[in-house]
Amino acid sequence: MSTHPFTICLWFDNQAEEAAKLYTSLFHDGKIGKIARYGKEGFEFHRRPEGSVMTVEFEANGLQFTALNGGPLFQFNEAISLIITCDTQAEIDHYWNKLTADGGKEVQCGWLKDKFGVSWQVVPTGFHEMMNSSDKAAASRTMQAMFTMKKFDIAKLKAAFAG
């Protein structure tokens, strides 16, 4: 049995290999696996040149992914996002800066979209515990602080939580 119970498939127009290279470069354990290419078969359906990249298998942050060049039929949206949990502000800054580079977009409350349109959340360790604290006043202050941010500032979130 596989050590990974499932693989996340990301449907791109034609940027699968570029996306896999970016995502694997972000994480110390990132690596690209098998690359499958389109053949002559099925051209009437896929309309891709023979030999062009069809799928790229890769691993990033311990997760298995397949990036598919499936064409413009489907676009990414915020209904699905990938969450990166960070221990330090330097980690948050690293992921945030890399993922918003070259056309990525900052969104609100720790969310961003990378240049491919994939949604990410870059959050500090302990964030969900602060938001779900039994101390409702502390959780409320944390939420108020969160709504003022795009990229999270750990010190400001902790200060808001502490009151």
Where are these regions (language model features)?
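Acidic/histidine-enriched, glycine/proline-rich intrinsically disordered or flexible terminal extensions
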Residues: A139-G163
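Hydrophobic faces of well-ordered beta-strands that scaffold small-molecule active sites
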Residues: F6-I8
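A short, acidic/glycine-rich surface segment
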Residues: K40-F45, T66-L68, E129-M130
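Vicinal oxygen chelate
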Residues: F12, A16, L26, A60-Q64, ...
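Core segments of cupin and vicinal oxygen chelate
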Residues: L10-G62
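A short, polar/charged loop-to-alpha-helix boundary motif
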Residues: F127-R141
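Extracytoplasmic/secreted proteins, especially bacterial periplasmic and envelope-associated proteins
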Residues: E18, H94, A138-R141
